[in-house]
């Protein structure tokens, strides 16, 4: 993404050329938009709870606060593996989830039988989720990629709290809803298996984006 910001700066410098400015009709505004990737989900949820933001993505939040109200056309760019590519492929939409397991702490060597291992619950949940993958249609392009952001506090203590974050992506809204329900079911199953509790917070992400082919005049200008 550092390269994308460099591209914005390069475009701004190019548009200061007097010959270029003569050909422009209107005004050009440059946005350095944060939070495209929608990471750090729990942190963003805390900002939402505080009323500081409503959406976890930079473009969504800028739209909400009116930053694009007087914009007629926007041009975005992204790094890729080609010298130049005009237009875009369709993009998955997604919801974000924070999964919090609560167990019971105990000494991992002296009395593990007195504890409820939240990390074991999370491991079972991840395994259950993996077994859902064959139920996803290829055409729906479902992608679910969780991470563990908190796995325990001390190595000699049975973990009593484990936190995961994940995005649930798919190419259409029905597929997102289906995959999200299966994700919840899998993670809750892990909690049931070991007697832990499971709390899942789901937040809206992006809707699927359907792209049209680039206009011929745009392709010619890009050349």
Annotate each predicted stretch with a short phrase.
Residues 6-90:
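Acidic/histidine-rich catalytic neighborhood of metal-dependent amide-processing enzymes
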Residues 68-216, 220:
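Midchain, well-structured core segments that form catalytic/ion-binding scaffolds
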Residues 3:
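Active-site His/Glu-centered metal-binding helix of metallohydrolases
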Residues 223:
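Zn-dependent metallopeptidase/amidohydrolase metal-coordination segment
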């Amino acid at each position: 993404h550092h390269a994308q910001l460099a591209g914005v700066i390069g475009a701004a410098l190019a548009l200061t050329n007097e010959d270029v400015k003569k050909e422009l009709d209107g005004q050009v505004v440059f946005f350095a938009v944060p939070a495209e990737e929608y990471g750090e989900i729990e942190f963003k949820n805390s900002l939402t709870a505080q009323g500081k933001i409503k959406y976890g993505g930079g473009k969504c939040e800028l739209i909400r606060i009116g930053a694009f109200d007087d914009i007629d056309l926007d041009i975005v760019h992204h790094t890729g593996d080609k010298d130049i590519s005009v237009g875009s492929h369709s993009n998955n939409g997604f919801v974000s989830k924070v999964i919090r397991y609560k167990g019971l702490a105990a000494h991992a060597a002296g009395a593990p039988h007195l504890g409820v291992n939240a990390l074991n619950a999370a491991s079972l949940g991840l395994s259950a989720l993996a077994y859902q993958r064959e139920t996803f249609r290829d055409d729906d392009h479902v992608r679910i990629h969780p991470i563990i952001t908190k796995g325990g506090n001390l190595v000699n203590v049975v973990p009593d709290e484990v936190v995961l974050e994940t995005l649930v992506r798919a190419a259409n809204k029905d597929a997102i809803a289906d995959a999200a329900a299966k994700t919840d079911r899998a993670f809750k199953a892990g909690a049931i298996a070991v007697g832990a509790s499971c709390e899942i917070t789901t937040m809206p992400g992006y809707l699927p984006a359907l792209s049209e082919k680039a206009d011929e005049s745009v392709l010619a200008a890009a050349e």
